[in-house]
Structure formats: C-alpha cells, structure tokens
Amino acid sequence: MQVEVQKRARSACTTFKALKSEWDEVRGEAQDAMTVFANANLELRTVDDLSFPETLSEVDVREALRAKRNAAFEAADKRLDERRADVEEIRRDFEKLANVEKYFASSIVDYPDDGALFRTMTFKSFRRAFSAVAQTFVDDLKAKEKIMDKLLATKDDRSAALVLISAFALDPLIEQDLLDEFESLVLKNELGG
C-alpha cells in the first residue's frame, strides 16, 4: 500500500508541474491584455489633457480618439475575461488534485521510489498538505512568503514541503530564492517528517 501511495504522490506532483506551461501562457496573455489597458488609459489621459478650441474639425479629432480608446478598452475587457476563465479552470484542476481521491486513482504512474522524500508519506497526509496549499492560492506575495518563511523556520513537514514545491509550478508569486532554499533542504533530507 505504501508503494502505491508513493506512486500516486509522484504522479500527482508530475501533473502539477505539467500545468506550469499552461499557467505561464495564461499569465503572459493576461499581461498582454493589461498592457492594452495601460496604453488605452494613457491615451485617455493624453486626450483629456488636451485643450482643443471648439472648432468642428478639432471636436471630430477628440471624438475619434475617444472612440479608439473605447474600442481598446472593450477589446482588453474581452481578452481579460477569457484569461480569467482560463485561470479559474486551472485553479479548479489544482483543487481537484488536492481533494478528490478518484483523481489520484486515475493518475497512477509506475514511477520509481523517490527515497526519503516519500517514505513517510501517506495519501491522507499528502492530501491534507496539498489542500492547505490550495487554500492559500492567492494573489498576495507577502502571504506566500510568510508561508515559505514559516516552513523554512520549522523544518518539520517534509510532505508539506514536497507539496509546496509542486504547487509553485502554478504560483509564480513565491520568490525563487526562497523556493530554491526550501527545495535544497528537502533534497538534503534536512526537514523532519
């Protein structure tokens, strides 16, 4: 049974990491949409700061610029809505991995044993640790760093460490140097558990 649990855990972690490219793509597209927003907003301020004399042709210029700005905002809104939907789908997958035993059962892959990293793990402890990480999947850098700092300080939960490292593939808010330090401790087997 323990070997089976280790295989499930290994398979699940591989699945988490496989989502990284999708997450990066969504973030990139969202950033592109935000750039459209920023450019449209800059254009709006530029237009509003101009003092046009009230001649027909200059009013037409102002209206044309406003129309262009509004079109940019509408396009950015649409793109952001699409990206938000993509992100929510990823988050649902993320939480599904944490909470549905059936998903683990369907993800079993015959991976070799990962040594000390998996020896103390059970399905229950893995799911509990991953669920805790899923609940902290928030857009708050300080909150993420606080979690990392706490785990680095206590060094008492290797399974939670493994899960957090996997979760980072979906959450780019954690500082990379903190992640590297934490992963190093796990690989050196310097965490308890």
Named regions from a protein language model:
Residues 1-66, 156-176, 180-193:
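Short, low-to-moderate order helix/coil transition modules at the start of elongated helical scaffolds
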Residues 96-193:
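Charged, alpha-helical coiled-coil and adjacent rod-like segments in eukaryotic scaffold subunits
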Residues 2-10, 31-135:
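Extended, amphipathic alpha-helical coiled-coil scaffold segments used for oligomerization/tethering
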